[in-house]
Curated annotation (Swiss-Prot):
One of its GO terms (molecular function) is enzyme binding. It is found in: Cytoplasmic vesicle membrane; Late endosome membrane; Lysosome membrane. One of its GO terms (cellular component) is lysosomal membrane. It comes from the Eukaryota. It is a single-pass type I membrane protein; Single-pass membrane protein. The chain crosses the membrane at residues 61-81. Its main location: membrane. Interacts with WWOX (via WW domain). Keywords: Cytoplasmic vesicle, Endosome, Lysosome, Membrane, Signal, Transcription, Transcription regulation, Transmembrane, Transmembrane helix. Residues 104-119 have a biased composition (Pro residues). This is WW domain binding protein VOPP1. PANTHER family: VESICULAR, OVEREXPRESSED IN CANCER, PROSURVIVAL PROTEIN 1.
Amino acid sequence: MRRQPAKVAALLLGLLLECTEAKKHCWYFEGLYPTYYICRSYEDCCGSRCCVRALSIQRLWYFWFLLMMGVLFCCGAGFFIRRRMYPPPLIEEPAFNVSYTRQPPNPGPGAQQPGPPYYTDPGGPGMNPVGNSMAMAFQLPPNSPQGSVACPPPPAYCNTPPPPYEQVVKAK
């Protein structure tokens, strides 16, 4: 007799768990009227009173997001590790020569010089900059040192390699 109340309590507890378990209320139309049925929480409704156990991984968007982020991270890390372990070979560049050009000497006062008209002599050919304050600001006087000085040639040591360290230290 003592076992009977334990069985009844277990049965009532099982019924209570069955009733309180999360369930899905599903419905479908049969003719013109809806028909209702219940599926468990881990099942999906499929219509016509059937419940399908669904693998809910397709509904876990965060799982797919983290999976894609992990794949991208691994690919990026592999790329950087490969670049560090096997660096690309250095390409030898051809010797870089710098050539200097001299400005031609100033021609006579009547010859036209190339360049924008505002930078010419006010009495020479070109536009008259009287009404233009910007042209007046950038105009050079006719006998200014900036307009008539030719650049000197570059020093001779520019095209040679630097002297050795010992020679420089001994010179001091």
